[in-house]
Amino acid sequence: MEQKIFGQINQEESGSKKNIYLMQPTYMNSSSVHFPYAIGALASYAWQFDDIRENYALKKCFFLRNKTEEVLNSLENPFLIGFSCYMWNFEYNKLLAKKIKGRYPNCIIVFGGQHIAPGEENLIKYPFVDILMHNEGEVFFRDLLRALANGTQLKEVNNISFRENGQTVATPVTTAKDFNFPSPYESGFYDKLIEDNPNIEFIPLVETNRGCPNHCAYCSWGKMNAKVRLFPMDRVFRDLEWVSEHKMEFLGFADANFGMFPRDEQIIDKIIELYEKNGYPVKFQVSYSKNSEDRVFRITEKLNKKGMDKGVTLSFQSMSPTVQKNIGRSNMYIEHFKTLLDKYSQAGIPTYTDLILGLPGETLESFTDGIETLLEYGQHTSLFVHLCEWLPCAEMGKKEYMEYFGINYSKVPLNQPHMSRIENEEVGEFSRIITLTNSMSHDDWKKMNIFSACVLCFHHLGMLQIAALYIYHQKGIKYKDFYSSLAEYLLSSDGAASNALKKIKKRLDDIIEKNSAVVFFDDRFGNVAWPFEEYLFLDIITQKDLFFKQIKNFLSNYIDDDALLCELLAYQSFIIKQINVSHKSFSGSYNWKDYFGALLKDQKDAVLKKEKVHYVIDDNRAAVTWQEYARNVLWYGRRGGKNIYTSEIKEVIGDERE
């Protein structure tokens, strides 16, 4: 598109045009926030048409959770206000919409987005909402504006629900035939946002395709957009050029299965070309396809060589065949997972695996066994365990599905790790965390959370990974037994690690009984929401020496050679990153580096040899404050296992020693 749509609009007088406002409020993550992509896409499509521009003025778009009175006072005779609704803004949107309706009763309030389920339920619940928009909205939002301008009956507009003569009406939900949507980047939609907010680090989200062929019960993606449609390559390339030219450091793709199509390799080549030319974008993140392994490997290999990718997902969601059947998902065979894990490891590409806690059919035993399987097959780099959330547009959100599997949830403050807390917030948002099913009691759910927090903190974040590997390979103790015993020990004793884990246990009780939050805030680590395992790690790392002194008593149950145990713990402490430490050294009597390096590559014949060693680490990027450490080392570095040293460990031979 040669001419910016919004560059033209902003120069026009609104005159007798009807005023339109669009809302997609979200939380800040520290100083960064995503561009409001949904409303940008809707506006860019609608305002390319002459009749829309002749009848309507797009007055302003809101993307932050401003005080509702400030928003209300900024409105000028609003004709229609569209709200893009998600779990992180639904309560705010309702509060603001109700206030707007009170002051401007003739203003048309439209709710759409991922949180608006099919049907008329939200119209019945919320009388201040006039129209619901379902599924994707570009074409149908334009059609709605046309119908309102021309006096056409709303029944002629697809994908909406509304009231008529005291009754609710729902029109057919379809997918638009026209997919030639203009880009909100190229249209100029974001230009004024950048100009008006120079201190905000905007994060761009680009679509190369839309849709998902999978039909996972916990997700609304495939249910709402099953057919995958491709945006033209010239549009994709121009979006990437815009991101690079505007010096955007981080780039995310909205694709559900990137790597599915052969052209995706060309897209990656373009990103790398722009990075080499302009230095931007620096980091790239996307959800990869699980069915295009060779292509995804080539893509991630290219990105990894440039240091642009945080790793590739090798996900299961659950290791239980029963659960997989219940959620409509098929996983790769575990032996094939092992092959892929080895392939990526040999190429030096980080991998991470996702599990979801609380899926229907999961039991305490199947959950802990599943994590044991992943560890035994070599996933030591990065594991994420997400709490299962009830979503209104997902299959799991249906009443019949919930009743069949005995699903119940706890309505808790918003589960959005790493968001910033807003002081004196007018209204909070909520997540609906599944804490009860036919196969999982509340007590089971709490035990699963304690177990996963321990595995993720002490193993995948590295706090006791070395010890667990040694005990598994030398003593034959299963990982799940080790970490279950560790949790019991910490909860029954006092000390550096015990306090934080006890706090998590208390919080889990409060989630069930009082609907408390599933994240922690701690001023030591900035205004950031931390999931359980990250909070546990951060609390312990601030008192690392006390922790290792305490934990020695527990480990002595498995390792009776006191000298070896002391040296193993010293090496474990040595490889964990700290603040204000740019140089450190270690001397020992065993080939720790080679031994554990081999075990992490799943070389089961690795031998721990008694030999004098001296290791050094130099890190000129060491964090100097706990807030910097929490953000850069743990939050940003977690997917690549960057909170522990690996390749940075250098062995010093003979006269080279300090």
Where in this protein do the model-derived segments appear?
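Radical SAM enzyme core and accessory elements
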Residues: M1-L22, S31-S32, R53, N73, ...
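N-terminal [4Fe-4S]-dependent radical SAM core
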Residues: E2-Y21, M28, R163-L205
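Short hydrophobic segments within beta-strands
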Residues: M23-P25, S84, G112, A254
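Glycine- and acidic-residue-enriched helix-capping/strand-helix junction motifs
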Residues: M28-L42
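A general structural detector for well-ordered alpha-helical segments in enzyme core domains, enriched
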Residues: L42, V71, Y92, L96-I100, ...
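Glycine-rich beta-alpha loop elements in corrinoid/cobalamin-binding modules
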Residues: Y45, E54-V173
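Conserved C-terminal portion of the radical SAM core fold
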Residues: L80, I108, F237, W242-A254, ...
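Radical SAM [4Fe-4S] cluster-binding motif and immediate context
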Residues: S183-A347, L357
